[in-house]
Amino acid sequence: MLKLNLEGIYNFLDWRKHTQTYAPQIKSIHQKLHQDKQLKEKYLGWLELPLHFDFKEIEKMKQLKNFHPNLDVLVVIGIGGSYLGAKAGIEFLQTPFKKTKPEILFAGHQVSGNYLTNLLHFLKNKNWAINVISKSGTTLEPALAFRILKKEIEEKYGKQLAKNRIFVTTDSQKGVLLNLALKEGYQTFVIPDSVGGRFSVFTSVGILPFVFANLDVASMMKGALQSYHDTFQEDLLQNQAYKYALARYLFHTQQNKKMEILVSYEPNLLSFSEWWKQLFAESEGKEEKGLFVGATNNSTDLHSLGQFIQEGTKMLFETVLNVSSIKDDCVVPHILNELDNLNYVAGKTYSQINQKILQATRQAHIEGKVPNLEIVIPTLDAYHFGYLAYFFQKACAMSGLLLGINPFNQHGVEIYKQKMFALLKP
């Protein structure tokens, strides 16, 4: 199960005093989250989703997948929360060197003609389908990609057969994409109206790609459900998600920290870090408040950003995501003719060495006046992906409400869109 280690912050904060001070406020916010009907109806469709998850929907998705047994590629079209959760879950659980069938590829998450042209070339001799994800259908990046990929798939299979290869995840009642799907006769899946994109990983937005990627969705939802129960505690001392949220809040408001870095030590967590960045940045970056969130993947980034973190401006704190046990591992061999001077690690696994690097780095950074939280999970499996993703969602809600902002909207995103459309439209 997940463990939150706060030993790396005690030199920087009077933690006991602060927990006593903020426990009543956190209890009040918790009650608001779970009892405010207006808030729940508008924004919190994700909050109790693990409790009421519709497993019949998974069977519907499996039937759809089985209808295309020879599919080589599913192209998931989306941006922001419409693709980050799916990408995070798939890369959390799969090795990059063992491709599943179908392979899950992504489009519509940028405007790169080079990327899309090469994707089309890759798909030319493949058996493929599309899952386009957008609540409204008006977000430019995925809409552009869908226009081009829709044309391509219709030219390859013919319009009638192509419509059985296009799956639409969108609003249930309204929107350009829904209207298009109904007119064309595409299979549709629903994004609940009360679930924002960055909180949508356990809806059809994430689950359909997970099913096509052959992930264990049932175990994932068991993990999310356990996380729901564990974070349902209104008592701060019994709720690790709320402790994490409070620590973030205190470093930002009382220690004047400007940035949080999520530190991981496994490449499988690179896309999870991107999902985490969107979750917190889009939730808290309002009213000139909020931490700037970044991510490092060590030990790679110890040879680039590590210098700044150790001795640069003391503007940040770190949250280390530690996976304590790795399924697939390497052992360093012993060599008699030791020309490389590495026999001091002979017999050790890569995981054991990686853990020593993690421990040494935390110690060095704490001594370098960089506060360190540590979140430990036992392994990289579907259960712990579900647990961890829900943990961060709940922590994010508490963290934003502690700041006094609404963590569930994102009006700032619309500003660049307005200016972009003004430049693009005649």
From Swiss-Prot:
GO MF annotation terms: carbohydrate derivative binding; glucose-6-phosphate isomerase activity; monosaccharide binding
UniProt subcellular location: Cytoplasm
Metabolic or biological pathway: Carbohydrate biosynthesis; gluconeogenesis; Carbohydrate degradation; glycolysis; D-glyceraldehyde 3-phosphate and glycerone phosphate from D-glucose: step 2/4
A cellular component term, taken from the record's GO annotations: cytosol
Catalytic activity, as annotated: alpha-D-glucose 6-phosphate = beta-D-fructose 6-phosphate
A biological process term (GO) from this entry: glycolytic process
Family label: Belongs to the GPI family.
Record's protein name: Glucose-6-phosphate isomerase
Species whose genome carries this gene: Aster yellows witches'-broom phytoplasma (strain AYWB)
Gene: pgi
